Amino acid sequence: MAYRKIGFDAGVMTLRGVSIAQFDYALHNQEILGNQSVIFYDEQSKGHESSVIDKFKKHFELIPYQSFSDLNRIAEANAIDAFYIIKSGERDNKIIGSVPSLIHAVFPQKLSEIHGDVYAFVSEWLSKECSNYKIPFVPHMISMPDLGDDLREQLNIPKGAKVFGCYGGSDSFNLTFVQKTIQKAVSSSPHMYFIFMNISPFAQHERIIFLPGNADMTYKIKFINTCDAMIHARGIGESFGLACGEFSIRNKPVITYALSPQRNHIDVLGSKAIQYKGPKELEKIFLEFDKDWSASQNWDCYSEKFSPLPVMKKFDEVFLQNGSSSADKISISIADKSAAQYYRLRKKLRSLSRKLYL
């Protein structure tokens, strides 16, 4: 018997990828799988984005809690079959005992951190790096309507200008050498623009534009359509990389740091990733970028495997089929542990090489 009524812990509802993923899973749990989704959220938190709360309210029953410990009682009172939570992945007190807990881990974790009734990672890369594919994974989904409008006129950006852009968590564009290279590049080329959404400002220039965060999907698509390419500069990299997927599915190339420790986005993009190791390579990419040639290429690496239907099929198989992927059934061999150690060593060597390119 599968779980049918699922409680999703939204915690703090923000503009970050975790809240986007939480919404997508809950929505398609209803629309594709035909189940019921109930959203729990932390009423005490001051970090909620009102636009994100409104987005959730349009589709789900929202139930507030004062303290995480209240969820045992609330889950029982609402006859929840299972409790889903997406979090960093280590053992903590964010688990409830009254119903099965479905743990979705966002970051690399040691094997000793496995807990809950079902435990899965958010990407194939995490499953490989941390368990040699023995811990299951359920990826995020990328789903965007096909709209043609952009923000160039609104932002006074000429049609012929080269535009590079990024959105994400406010602190996610954090490679200092990239920030400096952007400022150097706009000084070298009067036809180059950079636009950022929900990113903390790091420069003052009329062609480096910072926009506030926006949860509206139409606006997000207009933002992507404004860009000729994504410039990605999150030092740690991506354990999944929703924003990279959203640019890619809109047929925009992703320019990303080659030496990041977390590399799911690089694995998925494969040969279509435009990678840089240091400021010289990045400046060359900016200055030599051919927007017309780029627009004629196929950059989409996400439509086939990461659309809602295949993702929710995997979500159902891993999380909802009542024990078919139970955490206590995960068996890790000595060979698996050795493989995970090898991946960690490779990560350290990559990190040590960073200074060679600065």
Task: Locate predicted features.
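N-terminal strand-loop element at the rim of the active site
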Residues: 9-16, 23-70, 200
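A charged, aromatic-enriched C-terminal amphipathic alpha-helix characteristic of glycosyltransferases
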Residues: 17, 290-344
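Conserved active-site histidine-acidic residue motif and adjacent donor-binding/catalytic loop
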Residues: 65-72, 200, 208-224, 260
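Acidic donor-binding loop of glycosyltransferase active sites
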Residues: 79-82, 222-239, 252
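Donor nucleotide-sugar binding/catalytic pocket of nucleotide-sugar-dependent glycosyltransferases
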Residues: 116-148
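Conserved catalytic-core segment of nucleotide-activated headgroup transferases in glycan assembly
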Residues: 140-204, 210-213, 217
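Short alpha-helical segment that forms part of, or immediately flanks, the ligand-binding pocket
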Residues: 221, 244-249, 263-264
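Short hydrophobic beta-strand element within catalytic cores of glycosyltransferases
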Residues: 253-258
